[in-house]
């Protein structure tokens, strides 16, 4: 690692810092090639075809069966992956439909230049939401590189400072007027107004977090700016390498990635969505296996990168303190949201198993949000509930600090 890329040491060394990375797609998976057999439980299970690229790291990851968010909503399940809450039902939950990465971003605050990074390769990222229900905008491969390593010109920085000052002044006026308006509202309108004020406060907090980083230099790298459009495999590989650099330089501690597919890649003619509605056609199933195997190859590459790098802040490796998750909010192309495909690697969890939970249709079903809560607690976030959780996953443990 270049000296200029070494993260700044923390003043508080009492707890290790943690990171969270999620890889996803918007169309689910071909489940017959993804999940181990239902009775092939625990360590020593036979790794299925789609997960074969992860085999070298089998002691570093866990496969989960029968976890889901308890809904039957097809494509609308995609944005529910990291929250467990459907966006239009957010008002019924204390924290709305905030996603895990954004909850971590709130927890980390201004500890890093980017509280979170939401990125995409050939598919919009639909899984990241703030507590006010705002979907976090995503950036592409080139945008990711420039955000991490390209310094803004002095004039642009000066403009950004002035913009922050103006925005803060406007927010001050808004909050002052709000105090007057609120008194005359009905109870129903007061609830809506409270949501509006929460959004204003959220923006205020975001502005506060930006300011300290405007004058701090970005890390230097000898990596060249990647060229987009070289194909799904090359673009996705370049993106996970940038994600590893983002973790390595402590530029962020929360990243979500959504990956897709471009017609013509892997010698295939068609679209991911069309292939996902395979109707048991052998050629479509073969296409899905190729696309999804590539996602797992790049996840394996990310695991290897994190595993091979020393954690300059905590000691150990970056993988020891980075939870890497793969998941889909829609389980399969035919619109099922039952038994979501979920794999978790690293993060200090005890891995190496296929964990099977009660049938999602049974009265004893375990919410997928329990896994999300475990990830949050592992990260250091103090919470006993998250979204639709009923608790943590009791048998998914991690090494305590």
Label the model's feature ranges:
Residues 1-401:
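Ligand-binding pockets and gating/stacking loops
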